[in-house]
């Protein structure tokens, strides 16, 4: 599913440096997982041990042009063909966008939690029911978001 950058900016309540007309279909929080830079929106998440803002210049060189940031650093000013959506908290912005996306679908959600067995519990009903029902599930072992 594609989203216009303008729509994403509205949904997450972002300020912008400028707003170039663009669409994205992939969300990126780990610069090492880049696959389609032209369609990616990078969220510069901050953790206790890392800061996603450190990877923006590298991603820009790899053709990513859409970023959600909490700090507009001086080195970003030269990236004139990039969109920077500026928010107070990038994690909260990601959560807002995920909530908005989820509301586009009128389907029940089943959450599976716990320390062990989530993947098999997710896969078992899929294997039983996917021929009769339209089922959406997280890929691979990404059962916890």
Predicted features along the sequence, with ranges:
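Phosphate-binding loop of NTP-binding sites
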Residues: 9-12, 92-145
């Amino acid at each position: 599913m594609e989203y216009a950058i303008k729509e994403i900016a509205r949904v997450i309540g972002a300020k912008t440096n400028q707003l170039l007309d663009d669409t994205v279909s992939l969300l990126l929080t780990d610069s090492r997982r880049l696959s389609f830079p032209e369609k990616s929106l990078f969220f510069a998440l901050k953790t206790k041990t890392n800061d996603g803002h450190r990877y923006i210049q590298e991603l820009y060189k790899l053709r990513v042009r859409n970023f959600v940031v909490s700090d507009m650093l001086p080195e970003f000013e030269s990236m004139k063909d990039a969109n920077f959506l500026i928010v107070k908290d990038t994690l909260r912005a990601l959560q807002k966008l995920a909530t908005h996306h989820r509301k586009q679908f009128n389907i029940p959600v089943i959450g599976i939690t716990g320390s062990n067995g989530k993947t098999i519990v997710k896969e078992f009903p899929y294997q039983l029911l996917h021929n009769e029902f339209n089922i959406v599930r997280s890929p691979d072992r990404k059962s916890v978001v």
